[in-house]
Swiss-Prot record:
Enzyme Commission identifier(s): 1.12.98.3
Alphabetical list of InterPro entries matching this protein: Cytochrome-c3_hydrogenase_C, NADH_UbQ_OxRdtase-like_20kDa, NiFe-Hase_small_C_sf, NiFe_Hase_small_N_sf, NiFe_hydrogenase_ssu, TAT_signal, TAT_signal_bac_arc
Name of the protein in its database record: F420 non-reducing hydrogenase I small subunit
Induction notes from the record: Expressed in methanol-grown cells.
Gene Ontology CC annotation, any one: ferredoxin hydrogenase complex
Amino acid sequence: MVEMSTGTTNLVRTLDSMDFLKMDRRTFMKAVSALGATAFLGTYQTEIVNALEFAETKVIWIHGSECTGCSESVLNGGNPDIVQALTKLNVNLAYHETLCMQQGIWNDGELVNTSELNSEILLEDLYKEGNYILVVEGSIPNGPDGSGRYLVIGNKTFKETLGEAAKNANAIVAVGACACWGGITSADSDIEKDTDYRGVAFKKTDASKGMLKELGIDKPVINIPGCPCHPDWVLLTLGAVILGKIKIPDDLPAALDQYGRPKVFFPPDHTVHENCPRRGYYDRGEFDTEVGGEKCLWKLGCKAPYAHADCGIRRWNGSVSMCTQAGGPCINCVDPGFPDASRPLYVEAEDKGIVGANIDTIAKVAVGAAAVAAGVHAVRRMGKGE
């Protein structure tokens, strides 16, 4: 554990010498509390911007079965934005199916022309060269019957594409719930067994059914879940890998949780609920029963007490809002069981309570809860030297 001074100048100096993906939760919370989320991220943005020249890092970003929402989220990032990240880190985004012009020229079943005009040849050349970071967005169908032919791109199944891309990758990052563990496409249904959609390293919570395992490829994967994922989670993770802040595979056991998620963004022992902007209403036992209110959203199906992510600290849309702040109950889209574990999305989970207590009991002891909350906030203020 790293002890830190609460003085801002000393804190910034301390942060400059730290690897943020290796911070424990206490250190991370102290840093964010002292600097604020925007300033905290800005500290690392400055580190990136002022870094020495790097050798070019190639990134190959491939898409399976998905809605491209995670790419859109990353493109909307602002601290740093995608252009800053690519430019300052000297990243060559060699392939991205949404951003690159797609062409496939075939003649009698054979690829023809050059990599400049044929994206299929470009990918094959990149795979052979190796030395790249592979980003995977979207799930991978294994069906029907293990063939993977429910998703074919350029006369090749995406299952084959993933296998070819993963073999020579220096690092593999799964972006979004679908790539991490199947997501929406692997939701329980009458056809799920036939389609058999999987994540790169997991199928829901089962690591034995990840697609790399199916392909016989033994490589670690960094999972950045969410539906969509937060742009900071993606860009800061890629930045940490490129800058050498996290060594693969040596540092991964300490930096990642049991599902391959960076602990600094997805803390195992803390939840979205703890830093929810509506938390005060929960402490007082005040709950909305209809949409459009301003109180706690638990009775409208909010899953924040079970969602392990830093949304309440980081916020979205330029660090100004988040789902619950905007009036939408958290659906715990970062969980390996999503979406099935979150269903029904907008109905109170009557068989569950928050921290082991029935929610109606919480309401009956609202005065006591408020007192406890006041004490917690007082301790936090003392910890910041206020």
